[in-house]
Regions:
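Cys/His-enriched microdomains
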Residues: 4, 27-30
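N-terminal amphipathic, basic helical "cap/leader" segment at the start of enzyme domains
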Residues: 53-156, 252
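Short cysteine-rich clusters marking metal-coordination/redox-active sites
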Residues: 6-9
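Small-aliphatic-rich amphipathic alpha-helix that forms the alpha element of a beta-alpha
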Residues: 75, 98, 161, 167-215
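Cys/His-rich metal-chelating microdomains
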Residues: 12, 34-35, 39
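Short linker/helix segments within small regulatory modules
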Residues: 19-28
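C-terminal helix-cap and adjacent tail motif
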Residues: 60-64, 71, 224-252
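Short Cys/His-rich "knuckle" micro-motifs
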Residues: 16-19, 44
């Protein structure tokens, strides 16, 4: 495997994974995402001087430097985090960005529950317990390593944020508030990326698990929209997306 450094964001790039690339003055440069290539192409001399949009090492002090389009295209679902603590200021900046998401009639339907310490341990137990319910014989010896791994992997996340929203009977209002809350979650993910943090958004059966709702104190009339893991990335996967032209219909 040949690994080089993305001059824009400082992340490692595996050149054998067919990453985005640009040729400048006869030299080929590789990038972890198309957004980094776009930024480089706009001002290559800046990045050749070493003026990265984020440090080669993940910054321990949060500094927002990534342009919005670069943050969007370099955001990844990061499953492996470093144990380094995440500054409270970083979490607060992410949540402050979240509340500026568009929401119909200014309902501001979101609420954020930040888990650390013993609360995070209890969350890890509940996620393990949920997985147990999926096995016909959850006490079987061969199942135990998988359950232990789920617990350990969840506990290894430095910060966990549960995002709740309203669950009104009116289907129109329900859709409006859910859409607004997911936009708020996207704001969280993008600001985290701009701060050098990794995130992983979980939904599925977890957000409907009654013991978790009870633990988090989610009242009747509300539901969990998603759970976000936050930390400094230990590994950032390369990803591709289908070009928008293949997903777009223009009507005139």
């Amino acid at each position: 495997m040949a690994t080089v450094v993305d001059l824009v964001c400082g992340m490692d790039v595996d050149t054998e994974m067919d990453p985005a690339s640009s040729v400048y003055r006869g030299q080929t440069y590789y990038f972890c995402a198309p957004g980094c290539k776009v930024a480089f192409d706009e001002d290559p001399e800046r990045y050749l001087r070493g003026e990265q949009d984020t440090g080669t090492l993940v910054p321990q002090e949060p500094v927002t430097t990534l342009p919005v389009d670069v943050a969007i295209k370099t955001r990844r679902s990061v499953a492996r985090m470093k144990p380094d603590p995440v500054p409270r200021e970083a979490i607060e900046r992410m949540l402050e960005a979240a509340v500026w998401a568009p929401n119909h009639h200014l309902t501001e339907p979101w609420h954020f529950i930040v888990l650390t310490g013993s609360a995070k341990r209890r969350f890890a137990e509940l996620r393990r317990d949920l997985r147990r319910t999926l096995f016909k014989n959850p006490d079987a010896p061969e199942i135990q390593p998988a359950l232990k791994k789920i617990y350990a992997d969840t506990l290894s996340m430095p910060v966990i944020i549960a995002v709740t929203t309203t669950a009104p009977d009116d289907p129109d209002l329900r859709d409006d508030d859910y859409g607004a809350t997911m936009a708020a979650i996207q704001n969280i993910l993008l600001v985290a990326t701009s701060l050098g943090l990794g995130t992983y958004l979980r939904t599925g059966a977890l957000i409907h698990y009654a013991p978790l709702l009870e633990f988090l104190g989610v009242p009747a009339g509300r539901r969990i929209a998603g759970v976000i893991y936050v930390g400094y990335p230990d590994h950032i996967p390369n990803r591709r997306r289908t070009p928008s032209i293949n997903k777009t219909t223009w009507l005139d």
